[in-house]
């Protein structure tokens, strides 16, 4: 499974939001997309998903333009969690999550979808709320319920096979979570990659980005400013230029060589 952007651009309101972006997301890897507010991170992710039509260039899924793919194939190849995921008040959590597999796996029986939905709700820490209406949940619980729904979209497509799941595209998946739940969500992200699925996520906390990502893409003024492993990309020079951090806030672990930011709760928006 492969997902790649080729000279992709997007304009809105007479302003170019994403400039000529090219990048290949890798199966089995987590890619963190970081950058200051207004850099184009969410737009880039929406372009990769096909939720926004590209204003220039092309997006490929398995070397085929996504505009040429059937809805079922596209749904099974990538799934996106947006920051404004819709609420579906008339559904229980189990039914909401099960709906994630309707387009990507139309031949999967209803009972199998419901069983898989229950498993996913347990994974995101909502196993006790299977029959609950989503409107009765906190913001963090709703966010994890919708994470289970987009995971369902990919896992239903490969259910009962030895195939790897597709690409999870996650826009700020831990923004509404407390510290322990942030760790849970990012553990799920890593587990998805270990199964051979790809992950691209927009994240503001640089320390979490380094902790969970194999690759980092830095957006600045709508352009891909840097890309590569965290230890190569996240330097004091970059942090100062892109995020306005003070020189010396980026440190490196002696044992791993991975960078980290002090103070540890540094959020770069």
State where each predicted segment sits.
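The feature captures the beta-strand-to-loop junction immediately N-terminal to the Walker
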Residues: 34-36
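Conserved ABC transporter NBD signature motif
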Residues: 57-65
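ABC ATPase NBD coupling module
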Residues: 65-79, 89, 107-114
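Conserved ABC ATPase "signature" region
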Residues: 111-129
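ABC ATPase nucleotide-binding domains
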Residues: 236, 240-269
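Conserved structural motif at the start of ABC-family nucleotide-binding domains
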Residues: 3, 18-20
């Amino acid at each position: 499974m492969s997902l790649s952007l080729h000279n992709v651009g997007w304009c809105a309101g007479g302003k170019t939001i994403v400039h000529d972006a090219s990048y290949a997301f890798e199966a089995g890897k987590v890619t963190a997309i970081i950058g200051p507010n207004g850099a184009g991170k969410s737009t880039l992710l929406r372009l990769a998903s096909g939720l926004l039509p590209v204003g220039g260039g092309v997006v490929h899924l398995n070397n085929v333009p996504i505009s040429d793919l059937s809805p079922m194939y596209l749904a099974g190849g990538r799934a996106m969690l947006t920051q404004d995921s819709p609420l579906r008040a008339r559904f229980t959590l189990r039914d909401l999550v099960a709906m994630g597999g309707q387009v990507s796996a139309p031949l999967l029986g209803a009972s199998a979808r419901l069983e898989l939905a229950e498993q996913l709700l347990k994974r995101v820490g909502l196993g006790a709320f299977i029959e609950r209406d989503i409107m009765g949940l906190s913001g963090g619980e709703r966010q994890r319920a919708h994470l289970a729904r987009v995971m369902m979209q990919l896992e239903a497509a490969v259910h009962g096979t030895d195939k790897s799941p597709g690409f999870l595209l996650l826009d700020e998946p831990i923004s509404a979570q407390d510290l322990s739940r942030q760790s849970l969500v990012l553990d799920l992200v890593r587990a998805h990659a270990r199964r051979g699925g790809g992950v691209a996520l927009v994240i503001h906390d640089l320390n979490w980005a380094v902790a969970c990502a194999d690759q980092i893409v830095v957006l600045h003024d709508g352009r891909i400013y840097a890309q590569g492993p965290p230890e190569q990309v996240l330097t004091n020079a970059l942090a100062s230029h892109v995020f306005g951090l003070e020189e010396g806030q980026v440190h490196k672990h002696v044992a791993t060589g991975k960078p980290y930011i002090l103070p540890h709760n540094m959020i770069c928006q």
